[in-house]
């Protein structure tokens, strides 16, 4: 009902809205039988997927999500973020994601905008923004755990500062490269 509500208010027939709801529920990775279940029987992650399907039913050009993974367990968080990223790529949706999760920002964002006291403080790719980790700390933000780990390695082993690594797979590649060059870690 929640998914069909918006389109029906804009004149879409009930049958067409229900058909669209069935398609959207699959698109967000849920089984069709969820449409007959009470919202009180759904997990937090399922409720968020249903809410996103309801938004998608309105065929938006822009999807704005504020902390869509707050309160979810790590698996649920990753599933929701992967789904949002997939929808962004497949449907060509401009997606604006408000988050305090630097890991999500590093993994999924094409561009970051850091706000400080209501103004744009920084703007750029995740690599560019996280490369300015000292300035981020001034704004009360941290860097992804992977970059924090790499910075500690550089400090402990007196390694030259190198390209900003923002994912753990990049950390692994960087450490392997350093070891192949004879660095003792």
Regions from the language model: what does each represent?
Residues 38-42, 46:
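Conserved ABC ATPase signature
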Residues 117-118:
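Conserved ABC ATPase "signature" C-loop
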Residues 105-107:
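A short, surface-exposed alpha-helical micro-motif characterized by mixed small hydrophobic
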Residues 52:
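Hydrophobic anchor residue at the start of the ABC signature
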Residues 59:
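Conserved catalytic motifs of ABC-family nucleotide-binding domains
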Residues 63-66:
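Catalytic Walker B motif of ABC-type/P-loop ATPase nucleotide-binding domains
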Residues 16-33:
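Conserved ABC ATPase "signature" region
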């Amino acid at each position: 009902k929640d998914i069909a509500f918006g389109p029906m208010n804009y004149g879409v027939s009930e049958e067409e809205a229900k058909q669209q709801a069935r398609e959207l529920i699959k698109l967000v990775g849920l089984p069709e039988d969820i449409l007959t279940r009470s919202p009180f029987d759904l997990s937090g992650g399922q409720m968020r997927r249903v809410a996103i399907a309801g938004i998608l039913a309105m065929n938006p050009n822009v999807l704005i999500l504020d902390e869509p993974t707050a309160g979810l367990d790590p698996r649920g968080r990753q599933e929701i973020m992967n789904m949002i990223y997939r929808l962004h790529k497949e449907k060509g949706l401009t997606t604006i994601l408000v988050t305090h999760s630097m890991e999500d920002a590093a993994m999924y964002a094409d561009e970051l905008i850091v706000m400080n006291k209501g103004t744009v403080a920084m703007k750029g790719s995740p690599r560019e923004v996280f490369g300015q980790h000292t300035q981020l700390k001034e704004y009360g933000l941290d860097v992804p755990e992977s970059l924090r780990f790499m910075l500690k390695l550089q400090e402990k082993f007196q390694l030259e500062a190198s390209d900003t690594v923002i994912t753990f797979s990049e950390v692994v590649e960087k450490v392997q490269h350093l070891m192949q060059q004879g660095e003792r870690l």
